[in-house]
Amino acid sequence: YTLPAKDVADFVKLVERADLTGLPAIDAVSSARRPLLAYGALVLDELIKRGKPRAVIISAQGVREGLLHEQLSEEERAADPLLRAARDYNHLRARDPRHAAELIAWSRAILETAGLAGDEPSPRLIESVCLLSDIGWRAHPDYRGEQSMNVIAHAYFTGIDHVGRAFLALAIFHRYAGLKADSPAANALRALLPTPILDRALLLAAIFRVAYLLSAGMAGLLPRMPATCVDGRLILRLPEDLAPLASDRVIGRLKQLAKLLGRDYEIARL
């Protein structure tokens, strides 16, 4: 949890002075720890004054997690915790876990040829959202978007901040529910995202909506149907034996994706 240092300094001053019984949500703090709050606030206040940090990062982990982390091998410690968790979800919940690797490459080809392969969101977030893109397939179609969004918003992921988590959750919400779908929970997550990151979440959702309609989540198909941006057009290339996949639904979603990219679309033969 990352907060501006000024916000933390203002809060600890409030805790130092306030009657604890009057603080909102004080019931969330155990009665045994409440008498120590003012002392902890004083220490944190002094740390901020002396260290002059721009931001304060509060770990979501605790002593027990740290003890377990110390017992891991160096190789395990070096692993990216977010990608590890996303791969686990993909392995446990996707129809065909092999499909995610192909989707990563397929999505990157579109982003790179569209000139959108920048640093925001980071490549690891792009990879993670691809790995999480099929976790809701077992749910009823009417609820897949909302359920998948809630799973990601509350999952025990580490190595990710609030903006990154909201990006993942909203991209998968719109992948299932549609690009114009809405809900109170989705609105709350949108409030966390800068406009460029929200736009990228919608773009990834649009890419997934085309990819899954073409591949049904099965490995071995997307590499045979490359999609790239060339000379102001989004071009989907289909081999002769897969040409019947160019249904009205696929064309509609391809047109929607091309619009987000600011391009025309074309379906060509390989």
What residues fall within each predicted segment?
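Short, non-transmembrane amphipathic alpha-helical segments
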Residues: 245-265
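A short interface-forming secondary-structure element
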Residues: 234-250
